[in-house]
């Protein structure tokens, strides 16, 4: 009645739906000025899975939500730690001890109440991979930090024909301008990228879009007290404690955040403007259906 006085319930519902749509369009209007209405609708219909909601993945999720992506799947079994505050957008004094996926979900819904958010308190590895149906995803983001998990993620995405982008090493670096988007086989310098190239080659995976840095990794100060390896301050119930880690990389607020934002930009472009360009560039096929 408030919206459309004097009309029936069905018409009132239509008016309410229109008001919601108008508020949504207004919320993302600045993005629509660049992408257009059709692409904004594509983003609203898209489902993106982000594996790893830390320094990189947290910023990716934030940017995707602010870009209007309609459905987000968040995968991470970790809790926010005091040591995350220096670099993770989800980490504040008030969120320490909370599950990262829960904090990220609250942020997303505060940004866009109409978003659909699925959370998984799961450490993605080969033994947990069957929990995820990749056929539901329009895009997959790899922001996890274990080689075994990253390889499995790439294999699973490739097997389902789902686009994937992978973050290479962001720790022990100070130059955010040194990061580039490239195919994994065209990377250099980054130690993690080197391992990934070797392992993907073994598995005959020929392509993988990554974000990597040409900056030589710095050597962190070996101080047991600073690194928490002597007296871990991880919250109760944390899965991977500092005392159990071989090494803890140094980090800043301005490096992993840039990686996460670059990844989000690639996802948005691939789901919208790049998608259209690829369709226009599709090669003609022969009468038998094969490519020339």
Task: Please place each PLM-identified region on the residue numbering.
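Glycine-rich phosphate-binding loop and adjoining beta1-alpha1-beta2 segment
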Residues: 75-112
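Hydrophobic/small residue at the entry helix of a nucleotide-binding pocket
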Residues: 56
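Glycine-rich phosphate/adenylate-binding loop
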Residues: 22, 132-136, 144, 149, ...
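Conserved S-adenosyl-L-methionine
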Residues: 66-71
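Conserved SAM/SAH-binding loop
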Residues: 121-128
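Targeting/processing segments of secretory and organellar proteins
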Residues: 4, 11-12
